[in-house]
């Protein structure tokens, strides 16, 4: 097997086309071996195998610099840079390899830690400028998918690369897909370029000042080598536009490109996956609720930014929603500003966005939405430890970020009924923007009626009144708070249990009301505690006699963490919380 002997791209240099094709076939097999057992990005990697082999054959990494956009297509690159064991070895070997480019893992060949979209060209322009200042001659190659071109930073990178005017190669990997279908006017020109074999008169890359080459057969190694050789050493900004097939070489991934963008382990023979457990999900509940409400309210608009299934909007449901669902591609800044405009114009937009992508649009939420007090609704999903766990996709920072913005209410429902009551109120009110943090600890149901109205001033809900100890448990950690209260009861402590509901500000009346017969307050939040909900409560009590234990995750860049281990490291296992409370009461 060739790839077991390939320790670096230099080992490809002496191979002929036939041998390189075998390398590509073996690399594709290695990728399938990993993703079928370990899960991961399927379609993006399978479609970029031949291009990766050709790039490493033509260029001279690590001298020449490859910068991957998102880097969810870098598995073949890893196979060819000494990490084949992470694709052919044991599960432990696979666990040792990140699903994204990682200098911590391989500083020689992985230039940046990357996981979010539209960044490669901008990063590459930095390397371009550094090379030009130092007077060296390495090739700088940015690799970006057509889906990532919907993001604003990609436009900014193209603008700067053209302005610099020196050698940079931008490989546009055009598979006619984002995670789902592409959205945006740019794709009309990409289609025209594909249909004309790159010759149509209106070429937006040329208009930007780039040299341009098109290759229709983007999965043909021999032709890829020729086009890459033709631009190697260029002293001009150059785009190489290659037309590839997402999922190439694996029929199920070709047949259903959206479903096979990323996936859990599967049977390689037929692409079948273990049946999903028959449990409720907020994605399914939300999309069904929205579709039902849309029948009666034509102003209700479901908004997504490249991840429609995060809102439960499958292709079938997107068709049912019609014009009442809009996806703007991977463009969170556009989404935030657009929902502000929609709300100003009398619509009721609900934008579903992953916690990890909030940071991509902080400015637009603060400036375009909150300063204008437009009553848009932001539906934050995936926030907390039981979510994505790669260093580039940490979902722990949305509470500190959103709660730092004046003019935004951030609600934390604890169960299904409370979530939909809050959602209905947020849509109906017309005074200010509302964000909701969708629980990530499964769908729990209320055991008593929930409130249907939520005011603009924070109002905590005391679920049980005890004494000495008060547990204020927010959102996904409410059930944890319930269990901690039961454990404390076993030790003779009748703890007060509070559902705060509001994350962005404190309920002074409720907190002051605890001072008379409580000595200890525990706050629990499923996210970063630095700048978070609990620290606001600790600050409120200040120099008073009340002791406050702030429960949350310490600020950090955690990578591929185990949720229970992270909780344990932060003293957030239920038994640890009880131990700390007992110790605090005794000290």
Predicted regions and their residues:
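Glycine-rich ThDP/TPP pyrophosphate-binding loop and its adjacent helix/strand module
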Residues: 110-267, 271-279, 283-288, 408-518
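Cofactor-binding active-site loop characterized by glycine-rich and histidine/acidic residues
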Residues: 41-164, 300, 305, 314-315
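A glycine-rich helix N-cap at a beta->alpha junction
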Residues: 87-97, 163-177, 370-382
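Cofactor-/ligand-binding subdomain signature composed of acidic, glycine-rich
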Residues: 1-34, 252-268
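Non-catalytic terminal/interface segments that mediate subunit docking, oligomerization
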Residues: 250-359, 364-374, 472-475
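Glycine/charged-rich beta-loop-alpha catalytic/anionic-binding loops adjacent to active sites
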Residues: 29-36, 96-113, 136-141, 314-326, ...
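Acidic, glycine-rich active-site loops and adjacent beta-strand->loop/helix elements
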Residues: 70-75, 144-151, 172-178, 218-219, ...
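Peripheral docking tails and interdomain loops at the edges
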Residues: 265, 273-278, 387-389, 409, ...
């Amino acid at each position: 097997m060739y790839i077991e002997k390939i320790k670096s791209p230099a080992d490809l240099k002496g191979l002929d086309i036939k041998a390189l094709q075998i390398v590509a076939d073996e690399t594709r097999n290695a990728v399938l071996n990993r993703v079928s057992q370990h899960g991961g990005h399927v379609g993006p990697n399978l479609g970029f195998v031949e291009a990766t082999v050709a790039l490493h054959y033509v260029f001279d990494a690590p001298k020449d610099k490859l910068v991957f956009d998102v880097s969810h297509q870098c598995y073949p690159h890893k196979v060819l840079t000494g990490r084949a064991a992470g694709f052919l070895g044991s599960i432990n070997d696979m666990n040792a390899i990140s699903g994204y480019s990682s200098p911590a893992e391989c500083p020689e060949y992985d230039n940046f830690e990357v996981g979010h979209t539209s960044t490669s060209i901008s990063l590459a322009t930095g390397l371009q400028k550094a090379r030009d200042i130092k007077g060296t001659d390495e090739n700088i190659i940015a690799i970006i998918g057509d889906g990532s071109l919907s993001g604003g930073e990609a436009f900014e990178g193209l603008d700067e690369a053209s302005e610099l005017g020196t050698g940079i190669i931008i490989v546009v990997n055009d598979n006619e897909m984002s995670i789902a279908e592409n959205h945006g006017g740019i794709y009309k020109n990409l289609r025209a370029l594909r249909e004309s074999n790159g010759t149509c008169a209106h070429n937006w890359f040329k208009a930007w000042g780039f040299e341009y080459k098109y290759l229709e057969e983007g999965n043909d190694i021999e032709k890829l080598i020729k086009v890459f050789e033709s631009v190697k050493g260029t002293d001009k900004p150059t785009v190489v536009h290659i037309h590839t097939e997402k999922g190439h070489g694996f029929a199920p991934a070709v047949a259903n490109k959206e479903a096979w963008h990323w996936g859990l382990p599967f049977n390689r023979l037929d692409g079948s996956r273990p049946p999903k457990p028959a449990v409720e999900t907020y994605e399914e509940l939300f999309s069904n609720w929205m579709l039902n409400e849309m029948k009666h309210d034509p102003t209700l608009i479901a908004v997504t930014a490249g991840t429609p299934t995060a809102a439960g909007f499958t292709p079938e449901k997107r068709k049912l929603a019609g014009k009442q669902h809009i996806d703007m591609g991977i463009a969170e800044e556009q989404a935030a500003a657009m929902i502000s405009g929609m709300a100003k114009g009398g619509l009721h937009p609900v934008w579903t966005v992953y916690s990890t992508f909030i940071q991509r649009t902080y400015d637009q939420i603060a400036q375009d939405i909150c300063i204008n007090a437009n009553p848009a609704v932001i539906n934050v999903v995936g926030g907390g430890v039981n979510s994505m766990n790669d260093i580039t996709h940490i979902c722990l920072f949305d509470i500190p970020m959103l709660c730092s913005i004046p003019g935004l209410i951030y609600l934390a429902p604890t169960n299904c009924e409370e979530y939909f009551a809050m959602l209905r109120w947020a849509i109906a009110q017309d005074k200010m923007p509302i964000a909701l943090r969708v629980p990530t600890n499964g769908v729990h149901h209320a055991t008593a009626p929930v409130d249907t109205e939520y005011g603009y001033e924070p109002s905590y809900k005391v679920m049980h009144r005890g004494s000495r100890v008060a547990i204020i448990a927010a959102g996904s950690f409410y059930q944890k708070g319930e269990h901690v209260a039961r454990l404390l009861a076993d030790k003779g402590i009748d703890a007060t249990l509070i559902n705060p509901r509001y994350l962005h500000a404190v309920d002074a009346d409720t907190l002051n009301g605890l001072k008379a017969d409580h000595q200890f307050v525990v706050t629990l939040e499923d996210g970063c505690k630095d700048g978070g909900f609990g620290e606001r409560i600790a600050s409120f009590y200040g120099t008073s006699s009340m002791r406050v234990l702030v429960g949350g995750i310490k600020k950090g860049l955690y990578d591929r963490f185990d949720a229970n281990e992270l909780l344990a490291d932060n003293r957030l296992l239920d038994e640890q919380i009880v131990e700390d409370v007992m110790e605090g009461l005794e000290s």
